[in-house]
């Protein structure tokens, strides 16, 4: 999987290329080091491969490297941008298998989110708020100013649309279409016009 993509951004000065990686990172703004940029790109691919293989959990804030009982942000899935960012490079970097854990999580979120949509909004289909976790929590949590953000599930679905867009497999679209439709129907049922902007 890792060897599917090679990236060549040019050659670095041999004296710079011979430096330890941490020194190259510290000096990156001083001059050109295209080989470090290529290495960094491949490092990002490695992180996704290592933390999101089929049959595992999706990549979260700290991934598989968390060693704390009480990690920053509880090592949850912050689904207002962080989780999405983990997966943005997957399709363009030939890592489509790495999306499987996220796809599975979305099916599980939709199941939990259907209960949440009914309980909180008295509306059909499904919703997920700002965060989720191993148990696929979909309720607003933590601070109200960011927790009451019901677009987490819908925003995550962009990755599944990208998967379809890259592969154009009709069977895949049939599989994930109920998720897309359910999220869209939730918003169709809950969006309201702002009377001050008519």
Say what each PLM segment does:
Residues 33-36, 169, 198:
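Loop/turn elements at helix/coil->beta-strand transitions in domains of secreted/extracellular proteins
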Residues 55-64, 175, 192-198:
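Short, glycine/acidic-rich hinge or "gate" loops at secondary-structure transitions
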Residues 72-193:
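Aromatic-rich carbohydrate-recognition surfaces in CAZymes
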Residues 1-77, 95-116:
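Acidic/polar, glycine-enriched structural segments that form the non-catalytic walls/loops
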């Amino acid at each position: 999987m890792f060897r599917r993509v090679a990236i060549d951004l040019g050659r670095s000065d041999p004296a710079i290329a011979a430096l330890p990686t941490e020194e190259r990172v510290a000096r990156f703004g001083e001059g050109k080091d295209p080989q470090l940029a290529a290495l960094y790109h491949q490092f990002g691919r490695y992180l996704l491969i290592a933390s999101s293989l089929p049959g595992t959990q999706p990549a979260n804030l700290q991934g598989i490297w968390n060693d704390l009982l009480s990690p920053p942000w509880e090592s949850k899935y912050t689904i207002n941008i962080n989780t999405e960012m983990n997966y943005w490079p997957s399709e363009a970097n030939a890592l489509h298998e790495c999306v499987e854990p996220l796809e599975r999580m979305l099916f599980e979120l939709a199941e939990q989110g259907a209960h949440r949509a009914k309980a909180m909004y008295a509306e059909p289909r499904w919703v997920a708020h700002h965060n989720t976790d191993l148990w696929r929590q979909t309720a607003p949590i933590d601070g109200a100013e960011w927790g009451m953000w019901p677009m987490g599930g819908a925003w995550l679905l962009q990755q599944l649309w990208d998967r379809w867009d890259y592969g154009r497999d009709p069977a895949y679209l049939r599989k994930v279409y109920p998720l897309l439709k359910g999220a869209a129907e939730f918003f169709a049922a809950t969006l309201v016009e702002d009377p001050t902007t008519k």
